[in-house]
C-alpha cells in the first residue's frame, strides 16, 4: 500500500433518544407493532404542518458542542428529494446550506497518541420508515413506525487513513453520544449507523481519487472488514490500469465482499431547497448557555483523569471510560474503598465477562459497586483467593449478594493457618513420590502440579502464598 494513500470519510447517523418524533408527537418506541406509532404528519398526509421537537434540537446542539463545532444561531431545514417506498413525503426533511453545527473536530486514540479528525457538519433530519420483504407471500410491506424519528448526521472530513482509524473514530463518537445520553448507540437496531466513503490516491498527491460509498456496515468489525475489502478492490483496479467508478456499494458480510448497488448521488441529484412548511430555526443565546452547562465530563477528559487520579494505564482507562455507566460504576466502587487498580482488573475481567455473556448493560446487573469493592478488599486481606473469586463471581453477579456474607455462609474463607496447610502439603508430597523426585531432578514446572493438588485437598481455600512457601521449603 506504499504506492497509494487511503482516504476515508464517514457519515454517521445517530438516532436521538427523544420520546416523540422530530415533527410530530408520535412515539419513537422501538419494537412496536407495525404502523402503530403513526399519525397524519409522519405518514405524509396532505394539509398537515410539521412542528420541530425542541428536545431533539437540544440534543443535536449538545453533540455539536461536545465536538467543538460552531453552533449556528440560525439554521434552515431543507427538502432532500428522492423516491423510496418507505419515505412517505416523497422527500426527506434535512438541512443543507446552513446546518445546525459545523467546523468541529474529534481527537481519536491512535497508536498510543491522538489524531485530530475534522467534522464538517452536524445536521438534523427525520428518518425514513422500513421496508419489510416477505418471501413467504412474495410481497413487500412498509412499516412507518420509524418514519419521522429524529436523526443527526455527523459528517467527517476525509482525514482517516486506515480502517483502524475509522473504527477508532466511530468508537469515540459513540462514547460521546452515550455520555450525553442522547443516543443508545445500538448498531444492530440501526440507531447508530454509518456510511464509509473510501478512495485511494497516489502517495504524495493532494487531489482525491474517485470514492465509493459503503453501506450495510452494522458493527465495528464489519466497518473494518468492509473498508479493508474495498481498499483491496480499488488497489487491484488501479494496479491493473482500470478506473474506480463512483458508486454506492453494499457490504456482504457472509462473503466478505462489496457489491455495486447504484451510482453515487451528488447533492444536485437531490434538488435541495428550503422547506416552505418550516420557518428558519433560531436559537437564543440563553438556550445555548443552558445546554452547554448541562454537558457532562466527556470520555477524553475522563480517560485522562482516570490515568492521573487512579494510576491506570492508557488501555485500562480507555476500556473503563468507553461507556458512562461503566465509568460511573468503577468510580463508585473506588469510593467504597476498592483499590483502584484491583477494581479495574476485576471489572475488566470477571465483571465484563458476565456482562458480555449475558448481553446486558451495567445498569441491568444485580451486582453493586459496594459488592465489587468488598470483594477486592476480601482478596487483599487474604480472606479469599483469586480462585475463589473466580469460582463465586457468577453467583455474586446474578444474586446481588454481598461477598463477605456469601463467603462465610458457604464456608469459603481462605485458610491461612500454616499448620493446617502444612498437613495438606505433606499428604500431597507423600502421595506423589515420583513427581517429587522429578522436581528435585530439575523439572521445576511440576510446582503447578503440587499447587493444584494442595488446592484440591483444601477445596480451593488454602492461601496460595502460604502453599507456595511451604512447597518450596519442603521440596528443597
Swiss-Prot record:
PROSITE patterns: GATB. GO terms for molecular function: asparaginyl-tRNA synthase (glutamine-hydrolyzing) activity; ATP binding; glutaminyl-tRNA synthase (glutamine-hydrolyzing) activity. Keywords: ATP-binding, Ligase, Nucleotide-binding, Protein biosynthesis. The keyword Ribonucleoprotein does not apply. Belongs to the GatB/GatE family. GatB subfamily. Allows the formation of correctly charged Asn-tRNA(Asn) or Gln-tRNA(Gln) through the transamidation of misacylated Asp-tRNA(Asn) or Glu-tRNA(Gln) in organisms which lack either or both of asparaginyl-tRNA or glutaminyl-tRNA synthetases. The reaction takes place in the presence of glutamine and ATP through an activated phospho-Asp-tRNA(Asn) or phospho-Glu-tRNA(Gln). This is Aspartyl/glutamyl-tRNA(Asn/Gln) amidotransferase subunit B. It comes from Oleidesulfovibrio alaskensis (strain ATCC BAA-1058 / DSM 17464 / G20). The gene is gatB.
Amino acid at each position: 500500500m506504499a504506492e497509494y494513500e487511503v482516504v476515508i470519510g464517514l457519515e454517521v447517523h445517530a438516532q436521538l433518544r427523544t420520546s416523540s418524533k422530530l415533527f410530530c408527537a408520535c412515539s419513537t418506541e422501538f419494537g412496536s407493532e407495525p404502523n402503530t406509532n403513526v399519525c397524519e404528519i409522519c405518514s405524509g398526509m396532505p394539509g398537515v404542518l410539521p412542528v420541530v421537537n425542541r428536545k431533539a434540537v437540544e440534543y443535536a446542539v449538545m453533540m455539536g458542542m461536545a465536538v467543538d463545532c460552531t453552533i449556528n444561531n440560525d439554521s434552515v431545514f431543507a427538502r432532500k428529494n428522492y423516491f423510496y417506498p418507505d419515505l412517505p413525503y416523497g422527500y426527506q426533511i434535512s438541512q443543507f446550506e446552513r446546518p445546525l453545527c459545523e467546523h468541529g473536530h474529534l481527537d481519536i486514540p491512535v497508536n498510543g497518541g491522538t489524531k485530530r479528525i475534522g467534522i464538517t457538519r452536524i445536521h438534523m433530519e427525520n428518518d425514513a420508515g422500513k421496508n419489510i420483504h416477505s418471501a413467504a407471500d412474495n410481497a413487500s410491506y412498509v412499516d412507518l413506525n420509524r418514519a419521522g424519528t429524529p436523526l443527526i448526521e455527523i459528517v467527517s472530513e476525509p482525514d482517516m487513513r486506515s480502517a483502524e482509524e475509522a473504527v477508532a473514530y466511530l468508537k469515540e463518537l459513540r462514547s460521546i453520544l452515550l455520555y450525553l445520553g442522547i443516543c443508545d448507540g445500538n448498531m444492530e437496531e440501526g440507531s447508530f449507523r454509518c456510511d464509509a466513503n473510501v478512495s485511494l490516491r497516489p502517495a504524495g498527491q493532494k487531489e482525491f481519487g474517485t470514492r465509493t460509498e459503503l453501506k450495510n456496515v452494522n458493527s465495528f468489525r464489519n466497518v473494518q472488514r468492509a473498508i479493508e475489502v474495498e481498499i483491496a478492490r480499488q488497489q487491484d483496479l488501479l494496479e491493473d490500469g482500470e478506473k474506480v467508478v463512483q458508486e454506492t456499494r453494499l457490504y456482504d458480510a457472509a462473503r466478505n465482499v462489496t457489491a455495486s448497488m447504484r451510482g453515487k448521488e451528488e447533492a444536485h441529484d437531490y434538488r435541495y431547497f428550503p422547506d416552505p412548511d418550516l420557518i428558519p430555526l433560531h436559537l437564543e443565546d440563553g438556550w445555548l448557555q443552558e445546554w452547554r452547562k448541562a454537558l457532562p465530563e466527556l470520555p477524553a477528559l475522563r480517560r485522562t483523569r482516570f490515568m492521573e487520579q487512579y494510576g491506570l494505564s492508557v488501555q485500562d482507562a480507555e476500556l473503563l471510560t468507553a461507556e458512562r455507566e461503566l465509568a460511573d460504576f468503577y468510580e463508585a466502587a473506588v469510593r467504597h474503598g476498592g483499590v483502584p487498580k484491583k477494581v479495574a482488573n476485576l471489572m475488566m475481567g470477571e465483571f465484563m465477562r458476565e456482562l458480555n455473556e449475558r448481553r446486558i448493560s451495567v445498569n441491568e446487573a444485580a451486582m453493586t459497586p459496594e459488592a465489587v469493592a468488598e470483594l477486592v478488599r476480601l482478596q487483599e486481606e487474604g480472606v479469599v483467593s483469586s480462585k475463589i473469586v473466580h469460582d463465586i463471581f457468577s453467583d455474586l453477579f446474578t444474586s446481588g449478594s454481598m461477598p463477605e456474607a456469601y463467603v462465610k455462609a458457604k464456608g469459603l474463607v481462605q485458610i491461612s493457618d500454616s499448620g493446617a496447610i502444612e498437613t495438606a502439603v505433606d499428604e500431597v508430597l507423600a502421595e506423589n513420590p515420583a513427581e517429587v523426585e522429578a522436581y528435585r531432578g530439575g523439572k521445576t514446572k511440576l510446582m503447578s502440579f503440587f499447587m493444584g493438588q494442595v488446592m484440591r485437598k483444601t477445596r480451593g481455600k488454602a492461601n496460595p502464598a502460604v502453599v507456595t512457601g511451604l512447597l518450596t521449603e519442603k521440596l528443597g
